[in-house]
Amino acid sequence: MTILASISSIGNIKSSSKSNIASSSSSSSSQSLNSIQCCSCSLALGNTVGNLVGGVLFGTGVIVGSVLNTVGNITTPILHPDCGCN
């Protein structure tokens, strides 16, 4: 009887730790989702302008798109500090 009770309590500890892990991973995934949503505008702008320029000069368009993406990644956390883009 004692062996069954100890096995039962070990099972409860394992299920408790699993629920803690699940709740912590879900909060981190929502944090990363938040950062993706916050950063998407600056990235989309850089890609769009880069693609427009790339229609005229392919090499220059790629460079301009990369520069604008970098600038967007730097300015977004400054302009929107509540976003997770840092």
From Swiss-Prot:
**Which residue ranges does the record annotate as region Disordered?**
11-33
Q: In terms of domain of life, where is this protein from?
A: Eukaryota
InterPro entries attached here? HssA/B-related (IPR008455)
Tell me any Pfam family this protein matches: Coiled
Q: Which residues form the signal peptide?
A: none
Checking PANTHER family in the record gives: HSSA/B-LIKE PROTEIN 17-RELATED, HSSA_B-LIKE PROTEIN 17-RELATED
The family note in this entry says: Belongs to the hssA/B family.
Protein name per Swiss-Prot or TrEMBL: HssA/B-like protein 60
